[in-house]
Amino acid sequence: MIQKKTFIHPTSIVEKGAIVHEGAHIGPFCYIGSQVEIGSGTELKSHIVINGITKIGKNNVIYQFCSIGEVNQDLKYKGEFTRVEIGDSNLIRESVSIHRGTEQGEGVTCVGNHNLLMFNTHVAHDCLIGHHCILANSTTLGGHVEIHDHAVIGGLSAVHQFCKVGSYAMLAGCSAVVKHIPPFILAQGNHASLVGPNTVGLKRHFSEAKYKAILRAYQLLYKQGKSLEDAKLELAKLAELHPVVILLLNFLNQIDLNSDKNRGIVR
């Protein structure tokens, strides 16, 4: 179904069954599969393949040579009906690949709203990217990776399967992540290790009072020699006075130390 006021270049192929909403713009030499939905105001520049069960929201801009919704690279995948969901107002630059999910995950690879995925970023099956994230050039996400809101991933970095990068965290360029990066943290290296709090990002997003509370939480987690469980007890007390700390506490509570997929946190 192609609605009115929609532009589709005559060299592009839109399969029967695809839904292209009003105001969408599909440039030359694109392929849109039969189970794809493209929201209003979304622009596809040129030479883009969108396939599988893929839903793309409103006002996204997708640049040339991107591949979205194709079969993932998990060898266990046998053609199950899994999907990709992309929200609104994302900027997806050249040669980005976003693969469909697997039944072993949640069945969906998800990108939220207002994200920037720079050139040659790879988003593997079952990844979850929140809102307002930046993934710089040639970022590589393994399967089941989570990138939480306002996180920044430096260029040429890779994140191991099942790792989580917390909100407002930053990973420096050319890093390799094999453990979870908690919220508010700056990490760097191969393997990525703790540098300190993400001071530049925190000052940009938070008031002075909240910034100081986050620094206090950082001290409790990293600088007082506490076990993770003891640190969580102290963080819970701090969160009663400063709700911004709940973001860190919830992240740590999501980590199942007894799971065979637990990666631990960067130190």
Curated annotation (Swiss-Prot):
Purpose: Involved in the biosynthesis of lipid A, a phosphorylated glycolipid that anchors the lipopolysaccharide to the outer membrane of the cell.
Catalyzed reactions: a (3R)-hydroxyacyl-[ACP] + UDP-N-acetyl-alpha-D-glucosamine = a UDP-3-O-[(3R)-3-hydroxyacyl]-N-acetyl-alpha-D-glucosamine + holo-[ACP]
GO biological process, one term: lipid A biosynthetic process
Gene name of the record: lpxA
Subunit structure: Homotrimer.
Pfam families (alphabetical): Acetyltransf_11
EC number(s) recorded for this UniProt protein: 2.3.1.129
InterPro entries named among the record's database cross-references: Acetyltransf_C, Acetyltransf_C_sf, Lipid_A_LpxA, Trimer_LpxA-like_sf
Pathway: Glycolipid biosynthesis; lipid IV(A) biosynthesis; lipid IV(A) from (3R)-3-hydroxytetradecanoyl-[acyl-carrier-protein] and UDP-N-acetyl-alpha-D-glucosamine: step 1/6
GO function terms (MF aspect): acyl-[acyl-carrier-protein]-UDP-N-acetylglucosamine O-acyltransferase activity
Localization annotation: Cytoplasm
Keywords: Acyltransferase, Cytoplasm, Lipid A biosynthesis, Lipid biosynthesis, Lipid metabolism, Repeat, Transferase
GO CC annotation terms, alphabetical: cytoplasm; membrane
This protein's name: Acyl-[acyl-carrier-protein]--UDP-N-acetylglucosamine O-acyltransferase
PROSITE patterns per record: HEXAPEP_TRANSFERASES (PS00101)
Organism of provenance: Hamiltonella defensa subsp. Acyrthosiphon pisum (strain 5AT)
Family label: Belongs to the transferase hexapeptide repeat family. LpxA subfamily.
